[in-house]
């Protein structure tokens, strides 16, 4: 990236993000994008900034950094564009493969929601970041860890209550679209519903034990409830989880067997 941005730190990056994501929707797009590239040209010392010049620079950078090719900048894409590598703590959240399964997401959630409050506090987020640095074999001072924790809270804690909910963490980890959205159960025949059930159960039965347990139940409940209520809280999830277990866990072993879930859904699974 050009030298004008090489001295940026996480707090300055936050300031730029909040300035140009004016509608607070998690993207810089449309008019915001034009204003950002105009600002970029000024920072680089350009003279006589014209709409054509802004468009040229925009095309150049978007082709290099707009990984999703959706014509807008996500926070990770902007970080890659303007933060020096040693300050780009958002690189920690890059994964070799996309996070496309709510089971793995819920495993992370349960690990760091240490007090089972249904939220990730600043202290719990700090522990999460510290573990990420260790996993990436990177050294970090306590002060820097505090700065990154504070920046993450300001970036993702939209209601400013000092803690992250399920949706905030889903944004941080770039959780992919709800797996259940691809299925139209109401419009299907009985055979199609049985086939879909097999696919759905296999997706959430990550451990391949023939039963959903722990984060597998959590992931299924999260996706199922978000079909009707797009933003559920950790507290809501725990309530819905207990309702599902009360209804489906016939033998009371704390798991949902494949046959138990099929019975709940009014299906007879394939043997």
Swiss-Prot record:
Q: What is this protein called?
A: Secretagogin
**Which positions bind Ca(2+) 3?**
159, 161, 163, 168
Q: Where is the EF-hand domain?
A: 8-43, 52-88, 100-135, 144-179, 192-227, 235-271
* Classification lineage: Eukaryota, Metazoa, Chordata, Craniata, Vertebrata
Q: Which PROSITE patterns match?
A: EF_HAND_1 (PS00018), EF_HAND_2 (PS50222)
Q: Which UniProt keywords apply?
A: Calcium, Cytoplasm, Metal-binding, Repeat
Q: Which residues bind Ca(2+) 2?
A: 113, 115, 117, 124
- Quote the subcellular location field of this record: Cytoplasm
Q: Where does Ca(2+) 5 bind?
A: 249, 251, 253, 255, 260
What Gene Ontology cellular-component terms does the record carry? cytoplasm
Under InterPro entries, the record lists:
Calbindin_Ca-bind, EF-hand-dom_pair, EF_Hand_1_Ca_BS, EF_hand_dom, EFh_SCGN
Which SUPFAM superfamilies does the protein's record reference?
EF-hand
One MF term in GO for this entry?
Answer: calcium ion binding
Where Ca(2+) 1 binds, per the record, is at 21, 23, 25, 27, 32
Q: Please list the residues that bind Ca(2+) 4.
A: 205, 207, 209, 216
């Amino acid at each position: 990236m050009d030298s004008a941005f090489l001295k940026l730190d996480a707090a300055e990056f936050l300031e730029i993000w909040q300035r140009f994501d004016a509608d607070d929707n998690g993207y810089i797009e449309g008019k915001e994008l034009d204003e950002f590239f105009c600002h970029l040209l000024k920072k680089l010392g350009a003279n006589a900034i014209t709409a054509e010049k802004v468009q040229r620079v925009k095309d150049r950078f978007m082709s290099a950094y707009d990984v999703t090719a959706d014509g807008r900048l996500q926070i990770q894409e902007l970080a890659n564009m303007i933060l020096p590598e040693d300050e780009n703590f958002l690189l920690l959240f890059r994964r070799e493969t996309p996070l496309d399964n709510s089971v793995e997401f819920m495993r992370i959630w349960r690990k760091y929601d240490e007090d089972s409050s249904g939220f990730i506090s600043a202290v719990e987020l700090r522990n999460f970041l510290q573990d990420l640095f260790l996993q990436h074999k990177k050294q970090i001072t306590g002060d820097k860890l505090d700065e990154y924790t504070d920046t993450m809270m300001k970036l993702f804690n939209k209601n400013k209550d000092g803690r992250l909910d399920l949706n905030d963490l889903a944004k941080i980890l770039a959780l992919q679209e709800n797996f259940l959205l691809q299925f139209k159960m109401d419009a299907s025949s009985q055979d199609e519903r049985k086939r879909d059930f097999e696919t759905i159960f296999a997706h959430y039965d990550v451990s391949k034990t023939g039963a959903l347990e722990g984060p597998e139940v959590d992931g299924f409940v999260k996706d199922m409830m978000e079909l009707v209520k797009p933003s559920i809280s950790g507290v809501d999830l725990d309530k819905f989880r207990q309702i599902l277990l009360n209804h489906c866990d016939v033998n009371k072993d704390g798991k949902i067997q494949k046959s138990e879930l099929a019975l709940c859904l009014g299906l007879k699974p394939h043997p």
